Amino acid sequence: MEKWGILLLVTLSVSIIFTSAAADDYVRPKPRETLQFPWKQKSSSVPEQVHISLAGDKHMRVTWVTNDKSSPSFVEYGTSPGKYSYLGQGESTSYSYIMYRSGKIHHTVIGPLEADTVYYYRCGGEGPEFHLKTPPAQFPITFAVAGDLGQTGWTKSTLDHIDQCKYAVHLLPGDLSYADYMQHKWDTFGELVQPLASVRPWMVTQGNHEKESIPFIVDEFVSFNSRWKMPYEESGSNSNLYYSFEVAGVHAIMLGSYTDYDRYSDQYSWLKADLSKVDRERTPWLIVLFHVPWYNSNNAHQHEGDEMMAEMEPLLYASGVDIVFTGHVHAYERTKRVNNGKSDPCGPVHITIGDGGNREGLARKYKDPSPEWSVFREASFGHGELQMVNSTHALWTWHRNDDDEPTRSDEVWLNSLVNSGCLKKRPQELRKMLLEP
């Protein structure tokens, strides 16, 4: 089975490998090995790969996997260790992928939950007790941001650094496990991130490594959609590949780079409907995540986002998006506020953060000279932290993984577009775009 899987990997996936090099005078550490996970048989009913995600107002979705197909999909929870005052009933699914058969994947929504509160929970009446902390109901709130994670030594370093920061929600703009058809790597990824993802909600969108389609045999995103169910139904979407959520004064939109996005697509129609409901008094900050960057001065993946940008950028600009996070390019880059290919004080800041630790290495070659809209760029592994201090100001910091120490390498204070007065200039433009058929 393993040999067959390796052959499938070789024949069906194409990896573009970029070696690392110094940005300016920084000397980069050497690449690290792919993590190895010894295969170990556990009790078939013990919950594995536990992670949580936001699931509508005051609710969380708890996801876990068991090998026992008869295990129930309920979660017991409460505010004291070992004392479970509440019970949430859920659903389960499973999938097949050639010779692989997944375990039973459970999804259970719990709540309503109090904000900024620790809850203790147990999955399916078996196994260890876990705990989670709900996000605050108001500012300040901190997001951890890292994309293109994979399962390498650098991934582990990134996760260790994220674990040290006091974040409330993790944002991941695509490329999670780098399973690339080898389905057991979804299982090992779930185990790798469980210590963090079972405690704080992880909100993710898809990247190219989640597609895993085999023509006429396996549809796209089968593994991703089965394992990482996001609140698409709660946000009025008909696809797990695009959705939105609100938390503590922030409206976050997760878009799909690998599903239809033209103005006649379901995604575009949903996006218009979602933006029409945004209340900037309740959620003064508006952020967007997707995988393929629109503003990218790295040599890697040039122009791959151009078509999506042509379709969606005018709508995002008219709506006053503050920040756009992307991945895909295995490096870090931050722009000025931009729109239509040039600096614009009323456009969003674009941040590429595809440097979480993937196995393909770093993309170190950049365009020279750099575009006028590019502020900071470096090919190093790391993560970002976005602290929304209040309704008007946010602090963004990028932390390089430097000799196992989380080095703060880039930071900037951001003023919300609501506070800057930009949105007062374009209400008619936005209404016109939202009303277009």
UniProtKB/Swiss-Prot annotation:
Q: Which reaction does it catalyse?
A: a phosphate monoester + H2O = an alcohol + phosphate
Q: Give its E.C. classification number.
A: 3.1.3.2
- Extent of the signal sequence: 1-23
**InterPro entries recorded for this chain?**
Calcineurin-like_PHP_ApaH, Metallo-depent_PP-like, MPP_PAP, PPA-like, Purple_acid_Pase-like_N, Purple_acid_Pase_N, Purple_acid_PPase_C_dom
Catalytic-site annotation from UniProt? 301 (proton donor)
Cofactor(s) needed, names only, are:
Fe cation; Zn(2+)
What's its top-level EC category? Answer: hydrolase
Key word Glycoprotein present: yes
User: Would you name any one GO CC term?
Assistant: extracellular region
**List of glycosylated residues:** 390
Q: What is this protein called?
A: Purple acid phosphatase 18
Task: Please give the organism.
Answer: Arabidopsis thaliana
High-level lineage: Eukaryota, Viridiplantae, Streptophyta, Embryophyta, Tracheophyta
